[in-house]
């Protein structure tokens, strides 16, 4: 475990989590719960958005109807920053997810100290004992944990670790190829007590409507929004399109 400073602990203690999972479930009851992702770059696409202003993006996405925000903080592969997380949280009332490769509990304390309300744990990147330990640390800090799985084995591990917010990622981490059908294959394996989140490959309101019909409650969308000239407008159109399809 890395060194935990008193100042970091105090900053974490000062942040009162906003309830990431609760927000998703509340919005999903009557609407379309989108987790809008602030992502400057990615390993597969390179630079996605040169004009990357977290505060402005967060405000626009909240006004457009996002249920929550996801903020990339990994510097090496996504050109992210904890500063982006803090700025997004300060500029919006929405709960924020720290999206990073979290492997040590100090990163959880860092997340809360920088105003995160939830963290991402990638099942494929962790041994089971690590997954269980990090989940417990985050929950003890009052943070929600989005456990990301790519197949049935990883899903079972996430459930065994006590995760109640499950993300199914349709992107293959080895090839970066996206197969949205992966989300449909696994959704029935997720208990109804969990909030089901579909990740990657969502391009249209029709995709959202299909996923909603299959049992998903929330949809993590980043690249298509960040590529748009006005991400807020793009999200508004996406949600409206999904509503039209759902209400047919």
Predicted features and spans:
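N-terminal active-site wall of soluble small-molecule enzyme domains
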Residues: 32-33, 38, 45-146, 152-157, ...
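Glycine-rich phosphate-binding active-site loops on the catalytic face of alpha/beta enzymes
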Residues: 110-130, 167-176, 216-235
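C-terminal helical cap(s) of enzyme catalytic domains, especially alpha/beta-barrels
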Residues: 185-189, 212, 227-248
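Hydrophobic alpha-helical segments, chiefly the membrane-spanning helices
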Residues: 11-15, 19, 106, 115
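Flexible, solvent-exposed loop/hinge segments and secondary-structure transition points
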Residues: 13-31
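Catalytic cores of alpha/beta
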Residues: 103-115, 150-161, 198, 202-221, ...
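Catalytic-face loop-and-helix region of soluble metabolic enzyme cores
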Residues: 165-221
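Short, small-residue-biased leader/transition segments that mark boundaries at the very start
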Residues: 1-2
